[in-house]
Amino acid sequence: MKKKLCILLTLLMIPTMSNSTTKINLENYINSLLWEKRIVLFISKAKYVHFINETDDFFKNNSCENEARNLKYIRIVGDEINKYVMPDRYINKYGMWLIGYDGQDKSHSTDISLLKEIYNIIDKMPVRKREITEQNKICN
């Protein structure tokens, strides 16, 4: 009887174990990029197709400018949010955040307005001013 019970419990646990996935801790991921990358964190519901496309196009079409500024694009759209353990500051919030080398939010918008100002915001940062003088990268 005990043997049958053990087998039954084992069989019941296998599907549960195979469906479990490890979530990405967003705070830890952001912290792993400290002092290496500036981050644009983009969180959107899937229904905001225009917002998603505009943001994706910005990063695709401006790769040189983004690379020159050490920008890392973290894109979380729709159900992808379930893959993450979200820090309190982003729970139930949507939009776009510019996160500095220090891991702090530098700017936020709930539309594409941040993309229009992002280079100006970054280029005014003290560390970026130093980077500009040291960089040889020229983008067209």
Locate each region found by the language model.
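Non-catalytic interaction/Regulatory regions outside core domains
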Residues: K2-L5, T16-N140
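Repetitive helical segments and hydrophobic/amphipathic motifs
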Residues: L11-L12
